[in-house]
Amino acid sequence: MTLEDSASKELKWWAIPGQFLRQELLPVLTNLRLAIALLLLIAIFSSTGTVIEQGQSPAFYQANYPEHPALFGFLTWKVIQVVGLDHVYRTWWFLALLILFGTSLTACSFTRQLPALKAAQRWKYYEEPRQFQKLALSAELDNGSLNSLSQLLQKRRYKIFPDREKENILYARKGIVGRIGPIIVHIGIVAILLGGIWGAMTGFMAQEMVASGDTFQVTNIVDAGPLAAQVSKDWSVRVNRFWIDYTPSGGIDQFYSDMSVLNKQGEEVDHKKIFVNEPLRYRGITFYQTDWGIAGVRVQFNNSPIFQLPMALLNTKGQGRIWGTWVPTKPDLSEGVSLLAKDLQGMVLIYDPNGKLVDTVRAGMSTQVNGVKLKILDVIGSTGLQIKADPGIPIVYSGFGLLMLGVVMSYFSHSQIWALQKGDLLYVGGKTNRAQVAFEQEVLEILDRLSSEPKIEEKETAIEV
């Protein structure tokens, strides 16, 4: 073995990874079936994340997805938590699907779309009549000139490329943007995927139930990405007021929260009234109005100070939502009554220890209970807020913008026309990548215009030029 043979083998050894990428891995990544399969999987798991509630507590899944009976025979709370269906969009396998799909699109762009664009920007002049026979659409005219053809093509927004050396040859094209469109579509989809991945890695979701008049900071984070930043503690949010608008039949029409953002000194730096589909946004964090509840009730016994008692949501076994609390009517707490409320319309039901309805009182009214005057001053509502931060949203929106732009660009047909003047004969031919019928009609109209022009005038025009 010579030194040259040894060096050659060493070079081949180092070339193996590159050859594997080009010959084995790249054809798989650019395979259309793989891209379609990945897209279907992403769509299926995305819909799963929409159907199955995301970011809830383990107790929620245990209550709604029990082991016996299992939903569809297999879907239980254990399966949901093991597979990660309670946080689909942050699981390693879902992010891996996004990365693989993005890699496939990128590889396809570099191996197919970019070479196709470069090929579309290169052309050869047709110098022989036989070359026009290869085109799908061609014609031979005995009265026509390149000068007239060039003018007609320019009126139809074709870009003319005459041969500088030979004046009897012409090439024209339009719609090259249609070749760029698919590349822009791929860039847009990749941007959407990158935005989704970045949002999953750096975003978070929190939930807060805040009573009217309370101030809070974002602390109850239920789901967060591994790279999510800590929420700054130099600002807080105050719920100035929470209220519900009811329909004449007693149903809920809309619920509102009047909210203020406070700085460290307690000064208001932002203010907004939020309701469903109209959130508050501050420093990249969005506060959505999603739920409501009853936080407490303010009562007074005879002429005593005013007490604010908390109310808890009772278990009604799916028969609606009712909040309740217990109010002592004697100093030694030996006797008392239960107060129940189901909405914020101010109606409070009073029950004795035996479960008998004693009275029904509206806010601002009073009643006698166990020899004590009990006055219901107010029922205090609480707003349910879903708080999200997703730094990937601007990237996703930009990706959708590029996607729509690319789709529009792709509708432009890339049309090409060649022409050759041989004595009195004019050879014209063309092709397009889409809208073949419209292109044929356009070329036929151009040929009709050329044929209708007198031959003598064409010669005179050519001499003048």
UniProtKB/Swiss-Prot annotation:
Membrane-traversing stretches: 32-52, 91-111, 180-200
GO cellular component term of the entry, any: plasma membrane-derived thylakoid membrane
A GO BP annotation: cytochrome complex assembly
InterPro entries for the chain: Cyt_c_bgen_Ccs1/CcsB/ResB, ResB-like_domain
Membrane topology reported for the UniProt record: Multi-pass membrane protein
Localization per Swiss-Prot or TrEMBL: Cellular thylakoid membrane
Primary location class: membrane
Keyword field: Cytochrome c-type biogenesis, Membrane, Thylakoid, Transmembrane, Transmembrane helix
Biological role: Required during biogenesis of c-type cytochromes (cytochrome c6 and cytochrome f) at the step of heme attachment.
Quaternary structure (record): May interact with CcsA.
Family per similarity comment: Belongs to the Ccs1/CcsB family.
Name recorded for this polypeptide: Cytochrome c biogenesis protein CcsB
